[in-house]
């Protein structure tokens, strides 16, 4: 085999000659070390693309016959759709961000925020997967954590500190203080510190205006661009040049299906809490969720920058 290694993935090519059919191919490499590990594989039969496959702990084998009955395009779309659903439902940082949108927005603003997030991550997922946009994944993953932190920050900003003037200025300056401390400690660079400081100051102004319809869409679209680059890290460099568009499309549809499934369950749970225990229980639940957003968001940001 020939291989090419990088920080994010290992790419290897095998050529096998088998006289007997059907052929069963099994791949369980690294799964004893990391049960969540996935292999993205492009299979060719007699120099013709047979399909793109994903091997994981639950499905690590498939049978290959001379008849291309499944069709490479159909297998690519379905396999990557399943991969997208699995990725979003096991991506706890992405799920926590969606939960933050449910806590922060309601009715049409919730619809706009989820729409913006979908547009943003769909665009950057495609651009990152085809190699048009190349980003440092540790910074992308860290910024995903920071986006989660900011949903919790906005919730308490609007629902607690805005009506308590004695703490209001402290809450405004708190994220700037965190960024300054991380820069002094050498955890983040000067350019990242300056860029995020400008963002924090701008964001603090934007979130005070609840009357603007387009702002939830634009803000979550911006966050979606960051999350989409995180999604793209699962596909970039995999070498799916033949069915690249179908692979990205299937993965993105899978992410949307998983996202809607999780959002529906979470909304049902919040509605059930309200019905059984009253509005006060719902408010306490939102406080608790927003506290998780703050703590896990800043934890992931610092951890991924180290």
PLM ranges: what are they?
Residues 1-86:
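N-terminal soluble domains immediately following signal/targeting peptides that reside
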Residues 75-82, 240-250:
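Active-site-proximal inter-transmembrane loops
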Residues 86-226, 232, 236-237, 243-247, ...:
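Hydrophobic alpha-helical transmembrane segments in multi-pass membrane proteins
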Residues 32, 52, 58, 93, ...:
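Acidic-enriched, low-complexity/disordered segments with a strong bias for Aspartate over Glutamate
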């Amino acid at each position: 085999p020939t291989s090419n290694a990088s920080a994010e993935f290992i790419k290897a090519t095998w050529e096998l000659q088998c006289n007997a059919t059907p052929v069963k191919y099994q791949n369980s490499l690294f799964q004893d070390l990391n049960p969540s590990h996935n292999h993205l594989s492009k299979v060719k039969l007699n120099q013709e693309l047979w399909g793109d496959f994903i091997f994981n702990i639950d499905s690590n084998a498939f049978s290959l016959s001379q008849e291309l009955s499944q069709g490479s395009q159909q297998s690519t779309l379905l396999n990557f759709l399943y991969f997208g659903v699995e990725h979003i439902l096991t991506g706890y940082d992405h799920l926590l961000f969606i939960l933050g949108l449910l806590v922060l927005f309601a009715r049409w603003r919730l619809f706009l925020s989820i729409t913006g997030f979908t547009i943003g991550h769909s665009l950057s997922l495609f651009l990152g997967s085809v190699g048009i946009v190349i980003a440092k994944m540790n910074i992308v993953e860290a910024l995903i954590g920071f986006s989660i932190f900011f949903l919790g920050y906005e919730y308490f900003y609007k629902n607690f500190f805005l009506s308590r003037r004695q703490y209001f200025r402290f809450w405004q300056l708190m994220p700037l203080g965190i960024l300054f401390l991380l820069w002094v400690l050498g955890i983040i660079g000067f350019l990242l510190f300056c860029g995020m400081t400008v963002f924090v100051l701008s964001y603090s102004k934007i979130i005070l205006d609840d009357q603007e319809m387009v702002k939830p869409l634009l803000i979550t679209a911006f966050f979606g661009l960051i999350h989409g680059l995180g999604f793209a890290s699962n596909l970039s460099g995999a070498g799916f040049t033949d069915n690249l568009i179908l692979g990205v499309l299937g993965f993105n549809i899978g992410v949307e299906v998983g996202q809607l499934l999780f959002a529906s369950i979470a909304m049902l749970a919040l509605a059930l809490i309200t019905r059984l225990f009253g509005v006060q229980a719902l408010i306490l639940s939102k406080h608790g969720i927003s506290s998780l957003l703050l703590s896990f968001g800043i934890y992931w940001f610092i951890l991924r920058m180290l």
